Regions:
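N-terminal Rossmann-like NAD(P)+-binding domain of SDR-like oxidoreductases, especially those catalyzing
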Residues: 1-170
Length: 172
């Protein structure tokens, strides 16, 4: 858990957690992890939605983060087939809200979750960050590729250093 690691190794760092606590993943697991984090005096949890622009702006206005790590998104390739609205709201509108907040309340760096899904139907293995990613095979992948393009544009237009992490699904 990234937040726990930061709280344990950087005791003077304030960590703000935002989660809508939806039930795509088991809420009891989220609540158990949240209970561990709330033991730290320098941890603040806010239950809310990335797509709530007013909330995002108020968080940035109140806390003025130096570094933003956005791991929030609606996950799951298959779920995107039957629930496209959830992906547009969280992965596009929510990410746009984060980018806009980073623009209006300048940050040192934005780190965000992308996905290996951006490689789409690429048959070449191993994958490389130099591979073309212009052939998504799901709405989820398209939203993650869009995030990368949006972050790149904001980085160039508004000088927001950003790093996208293309996570792979873990089996086991």
């Amino acid at each position: 858990n990234l937040a726990k690691r930061i709280l344990n190794t950087e005791p003077d760092t304030k960590v703000i957690g935002l989660d809508n606590m939806n039930d795509y993943y088991d809420v009891r697991i989220k609540e158990a992890r949240l209970a561990e984090l709330q033991k730290f005096a320098n941890y603040t949890f806010i239950q809310g939605n990335l797509a709530d622009k007013e909330l995002i702006n108020s968080i940035f206005e109140q806390y003025h983060p130096d570094i933003v790590v956005n791991l929030g998104a609606q996950a799951g390739v298959r779920y995107s087939i039957t629930n496209p609205d959830a992906y547009i709201e969280s992965n596009l509108i929510g990410f746009y809200n984060i980018l806009e907040a980073c623009r209006h309340y300048p940050v040192e760096h934005l780190v965000y979750a992308s996905s290996s899904s951006v490689y789409g139907s690429n048959k070449k293995v191993p994958y490389s960050t130099d591979d073309k990613v212009d052939n998504p095979v799901s709405l989820y992948a398209a939203t993650k590729e869009s995030n990368e393009l949006m972050a790149h544009a904001y980085s160039k237009l508004y000088n927001i250093p950003s790093t996208g992490l293309r996570f792979f699904t873990v089996y086991g």
